[in-house]
Swiss-Prot record:
Its cofactor is Mg(2+). Belongs to the phenylalanyl-tRNA synthetase beta subunit family. Type 1 subfamily. It catalyses: tRNA(Phe) + L-phenylalanine + ATP = L-phenylalanyl-tRNA(Phe) + AMP + diphosphate + H(+). This is Phenylalanine--tRNA ligase beta subunit. Mg(2+) binds at D453, D459, E462, E463. InterPro entries: aa-tRNA-synth_II/BPL/LPL, B3/B4_tRNA-bd, DNA-bd_dom_put_sf, Fdx_antiC-bd, Fdx_antiC-bd_sf, NA-bd_OB-fold, Phe-tRNA-ligase_IIc_bsu, Phe-tRNA-ligase_IIc_bsu_bact. SUPFAM superfamilies: Anticodon-binding domain of PheRS, Class II aaRS and biotin synthetases, Nucleic acid-binding proteins, PheT/TilS domain, Putative DNA-binding domain. The gene is pheT. One of its GO terms (biological process) is phenylalanyl-tRNA aminoacylation.
């Protein structure tokens, strides 16, 4: 929100300096982003009129002007502005004036004397327009100091508003906050009804229910089409970042900036029949003020006449019904539209308007009739005309009602930790425009209709803290015993997990917790998905149920940008629900995804691509840090490559997945390389058993190697489990050191060779002991897995 300092001071008379005012605004939550002084150094700049302008004898683009500066004799000025012409009134910097870094001196330009400089608005620091001389009204008093004529010095102040403070999208809304902070009062404002002179009206039909519950309209006939915007209004608009256009348009903009009510002016003679508000119909077309013709769907609110849409409600007027410099009869609109009915509609069409921005945030539902009276008075004062009666069509049961809240003294003290005097509480709330009545244990407070962000007791307490001053809240240290949680040896913390993965050359990624529903459909992960009620965009419409879809998408973006070796991991929350309407459950997961070369390019190792076993090694290193013993079983997850993926188990419970992403899925994601990934629930992974010191055996270990022919369906995990169960405590380790299929092995079978390492803590094992163990192992494997010893 940008506004003129002098305009604000006209609504709230305060003695604070410009710097103090800016500091106060920031302190009460209206953060000042920029203060631009205007006209502080225009002491020798006056209003002047060009009497004659002739071409410079030595330069085609220069003119020699005779200028009346109110000094009795004409001054000769050489000027290069394209709009310099006889009769033009413009600012003149006299000899000796300081314009920015330039001191004006008498000089000769191409041999012709020049005694001053005719100025553009940019040269004077009043505007960004440098296309020509700053054109002043024809009736501007020649010889008067420009600063005096324009009401300078002034400043343009720009503040940053939080979404809840839509009431401060107006000078008067800001004035209430400043008055409360400076112990002042907001000046009285004349919004009295203007008596109608004619009986001309347009009927108003409300056909959008709660989306458009109020619409005020007024006909004004016989205005002067030659009337122009007065300099005081044009300057206030310009200093608020709005370029003056024409009187009727400028009046609607002026009322919006002053009161916060967007308005629109229609050329009455272009409207056919009653005015209505309704939802658009799919396929309807409308030519907008910016010259574009748009095709609407059924989500827009439209203003209509008897047979067509004539404006997009709350966004932009139509081209066919706009006011022009020939308009004599006008229909003024001032309405309240529900924010939800306007929100997002402008973005659909690539529109961003000041009116739309205000309606999206919320406009005072009681302001429409006042605004139309203020606008009427301005039209009559500046352009004449005969006003008809105001038509105020409303659906009262759909209009928001101000909240009435009990504010308790004890609650103020508990929330803020300080006591605020009763008199200060009443003064602050009253200055903010609230109706305050004393109650037994506090106050009954009714918020003004413009403050729809005030809904509960804590909202009022926030207002008190904001205006009373956060800097007046004493700094106190928290009391009570400090309970600092000590790291537990039975838990591997998240930082350690991150460090372990970083040590394995993985880089951490942080993705949105929201994903595209279409992406989850590709992964076939749509069960238990939690949709968002108000997503940031269609691509971020659901909460992620797993980390892998987002992580692999990030890997794909890196691959698309010619990153050959990608190694990423993420640790974050995932969300799922048992069914529609059930509360979502969140949990922590850790996931990794890799592709490209297994090792960074070097001269000492041959290049090879990363595979399942490389990432499995990274996973086992992570598991070793927590002492977890993981088991792997073939997986049937639809997003995994058949035969190259496994479910991960700990203590018999499935806690994750590892494998190659299915090639079809990778191709649909525009990834043309093999992607290896894993994903784990964090909680079962990080459980860590307390380390126990074991006795080192003084006796030697013995090894026996065995090779079995086993059916293809038998996994090494099943085989090794049988060995461990059979041997018992004598088994130190069982290792798979060879797998063979081919000549000498019948189809449907494979040869697995294992090494058994045996050791006893109390004695040296004999060959007889070892042979007995081997015999038991052979018998168990042959019995349980239909295997046979390979000769």
């Amino acid at each position: 929100m940008k506004f003129s300092e002098n305009w604000l001071r006209s609504h709230v008379p305060i003695q604070a300096s410009r710097e103090e005012l800016a500091a106060t605004l920031t302190a009460i939550g209206l953060e000042v982003e920029a203060v631009t002084p205007l006209g502080d150094a225009l002491g020798q700049v006056v209003v002047a009129r060009i009497i004659a302008a002739v071409r410079h004898p030595e330069a085609d683009r220069l003119q020699v002007c005779s200028v009346d500066a109110g000094q009795g004799e004409l001054l000769q000025i050489v000027c290069g502005a394209p709009n310099a012409r006889a009769g033009l009134v413009a600012p003149l910097a006299l000899v000796g004036a300081q314009i920015g870094e330039l001191t004006i001196k008498a000089a000769k330009l191409r041999g012709v004397a020049s005694n001053g400089m005719l100025c553009s608005a940019k040269e004077l620091g009043l505007d960004s327009d440098a296309s020509g001389l700053f054109e002043l009204p024809d009736d501007a008093p020649v010889g008067q100091a420009l600063a005096e004529y324009l009401g300078l010095p002034d400043a343009s102040i720009e503040i940053k508003l939080t979404p809840n403070r839509a009431d401060c999208f107006s000078v008067r809304g800001i004035a209430f906050d400043v008055a409360a902070a400076c112990a002042s009062e907001v000046a009285a404002f004349d919004a009295a009804a203007v008596a109608p002179v004619s009986t001309r009206t347009l009927a108003v039909e409300l056909n959008a229910g709660s989306e458009a519950p109020r619409y005020c309209g007024r006909v004004i006939e016989g205005i002067d089409p030659a009337a122009t915007t007065p300099v005081w209004m044009a300057e206030r608009l310009r200093r608020s970042g709005v370029r003056p256009v024409s009187l009727l348009v400028d009046i609607t903009q002026y009322v919006m900036l002053e009161l916060g009510q967007p308005m629109h002016a229609f050329d009455l003679d272009t409207l056919h029949g009653p005015v209505g508000v309704r939802r658009s119909r799919a396929g309807e077309q409308l030519a907008l003020l910016d010259g574009r013709e748009v095709t609407l769907d059924d989500s827009f609110l439209t203003i209509t006449d008897a047979d067509r849409p004539v404006a997009l409600a709350g966004l932009m007027g139509g081209l066919d019904t706009r006011v022009t410099n020939t308009t004599r009869n006008v229909f003024l609109e001032s309405a309240y539209f529900d924010p939800a009915a306007i929100m997002g509609r402008g973005r659909k069409l690539g529109l961003h308007t000041d009116a739309g921005h205000r309606f999206e945030r919320g406009v005072d539902p009681a302001l429409a009739p006042q605004a139309i009276e203020v606008a009427t008075r301005l039209v009559l004062e500046l352009a004449g005309g005969m006003p008809g009666p105001v038509v105020d069509a409303a659906l009262p049961h759909h209009l928001p009602q101000p909240a009435s809240i009990l504010l308790r003294r004890a609650r103020i003290a508990r929330v803020l930790g300080i006591q605020i005097d009763d008199a200060d509480v009443a003064r602050i709330l009253t200055a903010l425009g609230m109706h305050v009545e004393a109650a037994a244990d506090g106050w009954q407070v009714t918020a003004p209709s413009r403050r729809f962000d005030i809904a509960i007791e804590e909202d009022l307490i926030e207002e008190l803290a904001r205006i009373h001053g956060y800097d007046r809240v004493p700094t106190t240290l928290p009391g009570g015993a400090s309970r600092i949680a000590m790291p537990s040896e039975t838990q591997l913390d998240e930082l350690s997990v991150r460090r372990q993965l970083v040590a394995r050359e993985l880089q951490e990624t942080i993705n949105y917790a929201f994903v595209d529903a279409a992406l989850l459909e590709r992964w076939q992960l749509t069960d238990g998905v939690v949709p968002l009620a108000n997503p940031l965009s269609a691509e971020l419409a659901v909460m992620r149920p797993r980390l892998l879809p987002g992580l692999v998408a990030t890997l794909g973006r890196n691959v698309a940008r010619q990153v050959g070796r990608v190694r990423l991991f993420e640790l974050g929350k995932v969300f799922s629900a048992a069914g529609p309407g059930d509360a979502p459950v969140e949990s922590q997961q850790v996931a990794a995804a890799v592709c490209g070369d297994a090792l960074a390019l070097q001269w000492g190792e041959p290049a090879r691509k990363v595979d399942f076993h490389d990432l499995k090694g990274d996973l086992l290193a992570l598991a070793a840090a927590s002492g977890a013993v993981l088991e792997f079983q073939p997986s049937t997850q639809p997003f995994g490559h058949p035969g190259r993926s496994a479910d991960i188990y700990r203590d018999g419970v499935c806690i994750g997945w590892i494998g190659q992403v299915h090639p079809r899925l990778a191709k649909s994601l525009d990834i043309d390389v093999d992607v290896i990934a894993f994903e784990l629930q964090l909680a079962p992974l990080v459980k860590r058993a307390l380390p126990r010191a074991g006795e080192l055996s003084r006796y030697p270990s013995m090894r026996r190697d065995l090779a079995f022919l086993v059916p293809d369906a038998v996994s090494w995990a099943a085989l090794s489990a049988s060995v461990r169960t059979s041997v018992g405590p004598l088994l130190r380790e069982v290792q798979l050191f060879d797998r063979y299929v081919g000549q000498g092995v019948e189809p449907g079978f494979k040869s697995l060779a294992m090494g058994l390492i045996l050791q006893d803590n109390s004695r040296t094992l004999t060959d007889r002991d070892v042979d007995a163990v081997v015999a038991d192992v052979v018998a168990v494997i042959e019995r349980e897995h239909r295997a046979r010893i390979r000769g």
